C-alpha cells in the first residue's frame, strides 16, 4: 500500500513537471514569436496564436477576410499586416515581385505542404526545394502551357461547342409558361466546361462532365469537402506537419482504390499514365505526352496529373462564372460587349466557327471585360505563403527575420486605388479603354499577378487566357442570359478558390 502511494505521488509529480515544462516552453515560444514581429500591426489574437487564422479559414470568406484585415490594420509606413505568430500578409505588388522573381532567394513555406495528396511523391505545386522545383518546371512547363500541343486551340473549341450543345439541348427557355422555363446552374456548368477542357488537353480525352451533365466521380463535391481542413492545415504549420505527413496520408488520405471522389480520380489517372509507359505506349500531342517526351518518369507523371485537374479547372471556373454574373448584373456592360460581338460577326471578322484567340485579342472591349473580370474574380484566393530566406530581409525600411512566412492578399492587390482608381469596387471595363497605354500596361501587369509571378507563375496561364477569350464571346453571341434570383444570384464560399453553386440563369436563343 505504501509503495503504491509513493508510486502515485511520483507519477503525479512527474506529470506536473512535464506540464510545467511544456507550459514554460510554449509561453517562451509565444513571447519570442510575439517580440520578433511586434513592429507589425494586426488582429491581437493572431500575434500569439494560430486560432485567428484557423477560425477564419473555416468561414468561407477567405479572400474577403484577407482583404479586410489589410484595410483595417495596414499602416502607411510599410506593406505588411501580422496575421499569425510567424506570419505576415501583404497587398503590395512590388513585394510579390520581389519574393517571386527568378533570382529571389525566398523559399516556399510550409503552406505548400498541404497541396500534397499522395504520400509517395511531390508535384510541381507541393515540392518545397527550389532547385528541384525549377528542374521539374523546366521539364513540365511546356506541357502545362500547352506549347507542345498542336491541337490546343481546337481542343478547347471542341469543349466549348459541347457547352453550347448542352445549353441548347437541355436548358433553352421559351415563353413565360412553366414548361418552357428551364433554368441552368451556370456556376456548375462553367466548371464542367473547364474540367472537360483540361482533361481533353491533358489526356486527349475529356472525362464527360458536359456530355453527362453531372459531377463525374463526385470530384467537385470531394474537393469542396476537403478544402476547409486543407486550408486550416496550410495556415497552421503544426496541423500541416501532422495531418499531411506521409504516415497520416497513407492511413487516411485518398487512394487510387477509392470508389469515388479524389481517390477514384487518382485511380483513373494512374491508368491513363500507365498506358503511356507500357509496351504498346503511343506518343500523344497532349500535356501528358509532353511530360513523357521531356523526361518525366511514370511516378512523376502520376504526381502531376492530379495537379492538372485542380489547377486547370477550379481556378479558371472562378473567373468565368464570376465575370458572367457581373456581366448579367451590369446591363450597360453586357449590351456594350454584345454590340462589339455582333459587329465582329456581321463584318465577317468572325466566321461561323468558334472565334480564334488571335481574333479575340483584337476586340478591345472584350479584352477590357476579361481583365476587369480577372481583377474582381481572382482565380486563386489562398495565401501562397513564401518564407523569408536565411539572414532575413529588409522591405519598406523594416527588417523581417528569416523563417517568417509572408502571404498575399490576392483581392487586396486587385483593389489598389493607386493602380485602378478610386472606383475599384465597381465592375467597369471602361477603365481599360479610357486610359493611356502606359497606364493600361501597368494595370494589366498588376492584374496578371493573379497567375503569380516569375519563378512561381502559373504554368497554365496561356490556357486560361485562351478559354477566357473564347467563352464570353461565344456565349453572348448565341444566347441571352438572365439571372433568376436577383436577391441571391449565387451561393459562394472562398476556400483557396471560389466554390460556387446555384447561379441559376434563364437562357434564351439569340437570332442575329
UniProtKB/Swiss-Prot annotation:
User: Could you confirm whether the keyword Transcription regulation appears in this record?
Assistant: no
> EC annotation?
1.-.-.-
Function summary: Cytochrome P450 monooxygenase involved in the biosynthesis of abscisic acid (ABA), a phytohormone that acts antagonistically toward salicylic acid (SA), jasmonic acid (JA) and ethylene (ETH) signaling, to impede plant defense responses. During pathogen-host interaction, ABA plays a dual role in disease severity by increasing plant susceptibility and accelerating pathogenesis in the fungus itself.
Q: Which GO terms describe its biological process?
A: abscisic acid biosynthetic process
User: InterPro entries given for it?
Assistant: Cyt_P450, Cyt_P450_E_grp-IV, Cyt_P450_sf, Cytochrome_P450_monoxygenase
Q: What class of enzyme is it?
A: oxidoreductase
Sites binding heme sit at 458
Domain of life, per UniProt, equals Eukaryota
Entry GO terms, CC = membrane
Tell me the pathway: Hormone biosynthesis
Q: Which PANTHER family match?
A: CYTOCHROME P450, CYTOCHROME P450 MONOOXYGENASE
Give the encoding gene's name: ABA1
Q: Which residues cross the membrane?
A: 13-32
Please list the GO terms describing molecular function.
heme binding; iron ion binding; metal ion binding; monooxygenase activity; oxidoreductase activity; oxidoreductase activity, acting on paired donors, with incorporation or reduction of molecular oxygen
**Localization:** Membrane
- Name recorded for this polypeptide: Cytochrome P450 monooxygenase ABA1
What induces it, per record? Expression is up-regulated in spores.
Q: How does it sit in the membrane?
A: Single-pass membrane protein
Q: Which family does it belong to?
A: Belongs to the cytochrome P450 family.
> Which UniProt keyword terms apply here?
Heme, Iron, Membrane, Metal-binding, Monooxygenase, Oxidoreductase, Transmembrane, Transmembrane helix, Virulence
User: What cofactor does this protein call for?
Assistant: heme
Amino acid at each position: 500500500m505504501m509503495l503504491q502511494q509513493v508510486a502515485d505521488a511520483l507519477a503525479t509529480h512527474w506529470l506536473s513537471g512535464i506540464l510545467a515544462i511544456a507550459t514554460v516552453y510554449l509561453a517562451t515560444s509565444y513571447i519570442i514569436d510575439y517580440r520578433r514581429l511586434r513592429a507589425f500591426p494586426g488582429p491581437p489574437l493572431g500575434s500569439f496564436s494560430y486560432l485567428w487564422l484557423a477560425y477564419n479559414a473555416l468561414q468561407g470568406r477567405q479572400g474577403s477576410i484577407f482583404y479586410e484585415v489589410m484595410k483595417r490594420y495596414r499602416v502607411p509606413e510599410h506593406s505588411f499586416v501580422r496575421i499569425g505568430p510567424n506570419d505576415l500578409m501583404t497587398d503590395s505588388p512590388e513585394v510579390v515581385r520581389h519574393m517571386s522573381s527568378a533570382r529571389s532567394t525566398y523559399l516556399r513555406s510550409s503552406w505548400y505542404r498541404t497541396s500534397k495528396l499522395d504520400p509517395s511523391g511531390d508535384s510541381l505545386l507541393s515540392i518545397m526545394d527550389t532547385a528541384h522545383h525549377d528542374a521539374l518546371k523546366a521539364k513540365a512547363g511546356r506541357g502545362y502551357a500547352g506549347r507542345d500541343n498542336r491541337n490546343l486551340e481546337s481542343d478547347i473549341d471542341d469543349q466549348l461547342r459541347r457547352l453550347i450543345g448542352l445549353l441548347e439541348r437541355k436548358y433553352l427557355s421559351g415563353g413565360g409558361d412553366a414548361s418552357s422555363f428551364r433554368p441552368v446552374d451556370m456556376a456548375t456548368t462553367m466548371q464542367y466546361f473547364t474540367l472537360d477542357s483540361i482533361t481533353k488537353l491533358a489526356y486527349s480525352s475529356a472525362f464527360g462532365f458536359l456530355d453527362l451533365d453531372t459531377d463525374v466521380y463526385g470530384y467537385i463535391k470531394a474537393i469542396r469537402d476537403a478544402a476547409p481542413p486543407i486550408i486550416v492545415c496550410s495556415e497552421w504549420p503544426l496541423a500541416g506537419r501532422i495531418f499531411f505527413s506521409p504516415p497520416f496520408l497513407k492511413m487516411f488520405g485518398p487512394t487510387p482504390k477509392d470508389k469515388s471522389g479524389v481517390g477514384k480520380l487518382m485511380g483513373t489517372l494512374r491508368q491513363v499514365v500507365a498506358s503511356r509507359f507500357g509496351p504498346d505506349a503511343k506518343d500523344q500531342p497532349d500535356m501528358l505526352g509532353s511530360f513523357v517526351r521531356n523526361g518525366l518518369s511514370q511516378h512523376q507523371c502520376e504526381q502531376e496529373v492530379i495537379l492538372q485537374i485542380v489547377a486547370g479547372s477550379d481556378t479558371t471556373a472562378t473567373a468565368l462564372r464570376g465575370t458572367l454574373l457581373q456581366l448579367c448584373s451590369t446591363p450597360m456592360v453586357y449590351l456594350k460587349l454584345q454590340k462589339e460581338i455582333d459587329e465582329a460577326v456581321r463584318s465577317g471578322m468572325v466566321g461561323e466557327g468558334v472565334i480564334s484567340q488571335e481574333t479575340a485579342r483584337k476586340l478591345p472591349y472584350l479584352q477590357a471585360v476579361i481583365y476587369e473580370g480577372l481583377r474582381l474574380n481572382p482565380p486563386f484566393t489562398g495565401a501562397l505563403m513564401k518564407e523569408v530566406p536565411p539572414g532575413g530581409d529588409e522591405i519598406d525600411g523594416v527588417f523581417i527575420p528569416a523563417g517568417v512566412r509572408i502571404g498575399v492578399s490576392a483581392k487586396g492587390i486587385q483593389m489598389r486605388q493607386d493602380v485602378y482608381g478610386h472606383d475599384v469596387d465597381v465592375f467597369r471595363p471602361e477603365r481599360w479603354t479610357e486610359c493611356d497605354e502606359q497606364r493600361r500596361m501597368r494595370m494589366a501587369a498588376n492584374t496578371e499577378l493573379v497567375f503569380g509571378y516569375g519563378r512561381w507563375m502559373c504554368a497554365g496561364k496561356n490556357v486560361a487566357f485562351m478559354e477566357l477569350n473564347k467563352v464570353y464571346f461565344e456565349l453572348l453571341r448565341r444566347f441571352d442570359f438572365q439571372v433568376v434570383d436577383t436577391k441571391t444570384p449565387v451561393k459562394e464560399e472562398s476556400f483557396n478558390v471560389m466554390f460556387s453553386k446555384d447561379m441559376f440563369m434563364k437562357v434564351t436563343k439569340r437570332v442575329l
